[in-house]
């Protein structure tokens, strides 16, 4: 009988105590996002399909969090150096993703990370496997994008004094 009462008491305590959902540890969301971006969008060089797809993915993430978000394209060019030292212009169209969080004051805080990976600027770069389609870019710069997306996730319902603009850029190596 004592054993039954103890079991009933233990079972009752289980239903009385509040259930606490475990919240993700700081950095978990950033880690998941960075790994997703690096895995599913390797070779995110400015103007490539992978760069455009990753920009759209980031825009969608911001929109799912409730931010106004859009993609703006820009044209740029850079000098590519061939093996024979001949230089030529390469034209690219890059993408920038911008998401907005309004604040009380007109001033803004800008949080930036670049979404593209390194593009080979010469045949020597390509030969040394610097950049290119296989580069996953965890440190260039999926990790920065992950941190930016976690900040956006954590701030989405927080009133702020200043507005916040999250900006994911591309083309910084090319100019």
Outline where the language-model segments fall.
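Bacterial N-terminal signal peptides that target proteins for export
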Residues: 1-9
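Bacterial N-terminal signal peptides
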Residues: 8-18
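Loop/turn elements at helix/coil->beta-strand transitions in domains of secreted/extracellular proteins
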Residues: 32, 65-67, 105-109, 160-165
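Active-site-proximal beta-strand/loop segments in catalytic clefts of secreted hydrolases
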Residues: 40, 72-75, 101-103, 112-116, ...
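Extracytoplasmic/secreted cell-surface and envelope-processing proteins
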Residues: 80-82, 119-122, 174-175
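Acidic/histidine-rich catalytic neighborhood of metal-dependent amide-processing enzymes
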Residues: 93, 132-175
